[in-house]
């Protein structure tokens, strides 16, 4: 008998997700059972945790389990647990809405590519809603631990626009989900089919999964039915590594993360001594859709003495390793540990240090043993790893070895060059690791600042990620060699510099009056005007001084909404270039001014990628071109 019934509309994002999910995940539909068993396992974990402080929540029934039964006549499959259960408000919150930040953005990323959509939805984690892949109606009966039998809740929906919720009586604690299977999904109402799926997806969870099975006598006659445990029901991380198959590790990752894709790699460690803990760390194959969302949930699943404590314990991994998934089972933390206690705890600090080191070792080994696989990792998570040098001084050298960059050594935008690779190829007499930053790879590759380096065959790292300039303010050297930008006005090439000092000195004297004339014209708009001998094909460049912020750093601050002082550039002119030589001979002041302005604007455009007044630049260009073509 149900009371207080109401019909409610799904949150719009739920409706959209249900439609997309049924379409995109149809080819992998058996995962619905994994998701529902995984939820039941989580419900048991949460009850165990709450019962640490309130044992009465067990209600005399501490034997936690998941039970599965089916009814061929009715076409139903039922998954039940005796875990924490839900109240009416929790049912509405969990089954009627998606309480994830960035959900709208995620849904807008889904399109017509079914394979890509399937992967994205898998990363998002559909959980309970996966039931609608195979069912045209879902019924949920649930009672929260510690509340009376008449405070249970009935939830029903056909997975379209709305659902109903009502109060019912339910003696047993926990949640019972009944799937009314579609006509073409009745193959799931089969004992051996269910055993196969559960063995494949849920053998690793620490909770018994039981199926209602028929009993037979010695002559093969049916004598009744009984509940039969069909999984190992031993937490995977407590087992010996040599007993665990690759497939079991992969399925456990999917249970932990609700990701549908196999992980890239994992490491399972049991540590004894000053600290006693077991860790199982995974590197996903794909970056989650919300990796750069500030509210992105990350961290390890925390157990203390095999008792679940919390999801997403962020304190055990630094932020630059937030892509790592897995669990930690510690013997040294108290069972009543809270997020607040974790923040300021010596044991936590020691565990974080050890787990960070282990995660970095995993990546070091991957980079050494399988460059192609490491490149796949870098394409997904390289941007996050670049946050490391600023966050983790103690491991800065290790992180630096893991970084990858594009370079003039390769004719490719792929970031595949390590700092160790670069150092091994350095020219004799080269003292620094040279780099250039720009908005894009193409802009970096074609920067006029590269001309002298290309001429001399000196490798330069080409950096175009927004984070690069910020990262390099923390990563200033590697292997005892400074990292040096080539866009500075006072670039010192040391032993690699040209030895033609006499001819350069003569040019400086020859063009001294020209340089003064340009200085007078531009005045305070530039920091300095000088000749340069590091260009081959370009008439002029602008550069910043050693005491100034670089162009890319200024852009970074501006993008963050911070007011920054104007960058005053040094204007460098190439006396070997025919255009500069011609302009130096112009006597008419207006014509001279127009050409100098054009050269400055060109240099600014090459450096910054934009101009404050592009219309004036175009007009000036057209005027000068018209004069040239009229002769």
Curated annotation (Swiss-Prot):
Q: Where is this region: B?
A: 340-555
Which stretches does the entry tag as region C?
556-631
Please report the organism this UniProt entry assigns to the protein: Pasteurella multocida (strain Pm70)
Q: Where is the signal peptide?
A: none
Q: Report the SS bond pairs.
A: none
Query: Region entry A: which residue ranges?
Result: 1-339
Q: What does this protein do?
A: Molecular chaperone. Has ATPase activity.
- Entry's localization field: Cytoplasm
Report what the protein is called: Chaperone protein HtpG
């Amino acid at each position: 008998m149900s009371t207080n019934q109401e019909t409610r509309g799904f949150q719009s994002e739920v409706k959209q997700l249900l439609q997309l999910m049924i379409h995109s995940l149809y080819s992998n539909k058996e995962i619905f059972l994994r998701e529902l068993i995984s939820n039941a396992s989580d419900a048991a974990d949460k009850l165990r945790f709450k019962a640490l402080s309130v044992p009465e929540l067990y209600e005399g029934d501490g034997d936690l389990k998941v039970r599965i039964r089916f009814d061929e006549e009715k076409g139903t499959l039922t998954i039940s647990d005796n875990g924490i259960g839900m109240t009416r408000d929790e049912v509405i919150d969990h089954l009627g809405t998606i309480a994830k930040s960035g959900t709208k953005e995620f849904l807008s990323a889904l399109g017509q590519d079914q394979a890509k959509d399937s992967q994205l939805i898998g990363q998002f984690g559909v959980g309970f809603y996966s039931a609608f892949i195979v069912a045209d109606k879902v019924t949920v009966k649930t009672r929260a631990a510690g509340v009376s039998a008449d405070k249970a809740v009935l939830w029903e929906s056909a997975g379209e626009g709305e659902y109903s919720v009502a109060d019912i009586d339910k003696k047993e604690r926990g949640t019972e989900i009944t799937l009314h299977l579609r006509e073409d999904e009745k193959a799931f109402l089969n004992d051996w089919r269910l055993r196969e799926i559960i063995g494949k997806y849920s053998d690793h969870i620490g909770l018994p999964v039981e199926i209602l099975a028929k009993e037979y006598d010695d002559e093969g006659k049916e004598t009744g039915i009984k509940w039969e445990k069909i999984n190992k029901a031993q937490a995977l991380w407590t087992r010996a590594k040599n007993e665990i198959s690759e497939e079991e590790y992969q399925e456990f990752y999917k249970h932990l993360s609700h990701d549908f894709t196999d992980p890239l790699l994992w490491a399972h460690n049991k540590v004894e001594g000053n600290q006693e803990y077991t860790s199982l760390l995974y590197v996903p194959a794909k970056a989650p859709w919300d990796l750069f969302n500030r509210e992105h949930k990350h961290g390890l699943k925390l157990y203390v003495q095999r008792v679940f404590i919390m999801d997403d314990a962020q304190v055990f991994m630094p932020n630059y390793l937030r892509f790592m998934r897995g669990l930690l089972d510690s013997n040294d933390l108290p069972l009543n540990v809270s997020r607040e206690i974790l923040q300021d705890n010596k044991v936590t600090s020691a565990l974080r240090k050890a787990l960070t080191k282990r995660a970095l070792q995993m990546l070091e080994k991957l980079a050494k043993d399988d460059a192609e696989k490491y490149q796949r990792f870098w394409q997904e998570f390289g941007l996050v790893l670049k946050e490391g040098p600023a966050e983790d001084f103690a491991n800065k050298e290790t992180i630096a070895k893991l970084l990858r960059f594009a370079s003039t050594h390769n004719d490719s935008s792929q970031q595949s060059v390590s700092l160790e690779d670069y150092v091994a190829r350095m020219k004799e007499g080269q003292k620094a690791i040279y780099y250039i930053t720009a908005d894009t790879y193409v802009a970096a590759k074609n920067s006029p600042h590269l001309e002298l380096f290309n001429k001399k065959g000196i490798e330069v790292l080409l950096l175009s990620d927004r984070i690069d300039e910020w990262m390099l303010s923390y990563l200033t050297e590697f292997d005892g060699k400074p990292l040096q930008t080539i866009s500075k006005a006072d670039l010192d090439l040391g032993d690699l510099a040209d030895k033609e000092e006499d001819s350069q000195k003569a040019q400086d004297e020859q063009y001294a009056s020209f340089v003064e004339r340009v200085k007078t014209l531009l005045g305070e708009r530039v920091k300095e005007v000088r000749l340069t001998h590091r260009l081959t094909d370009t008439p002029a460049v602008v550069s910043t001084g050693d005491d100034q912020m670089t162009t890319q750093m200024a852009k970074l601050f501006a993008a963050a909404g911070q007011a920054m002082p104007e960058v005053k550039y040094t204007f460098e002119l190439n006396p070997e270039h025919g255009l500069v030589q011609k302009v130096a001979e112009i006597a008419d002041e207006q014509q001279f001014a127009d050409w100098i302005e054009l050269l400055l604007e060109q240099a600014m455009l090459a450096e910054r990628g934009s101009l404050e007044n592009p219309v004036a630049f175009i007009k000036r260009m057209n005027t000068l071109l018209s004069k040239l073509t009229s002769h």
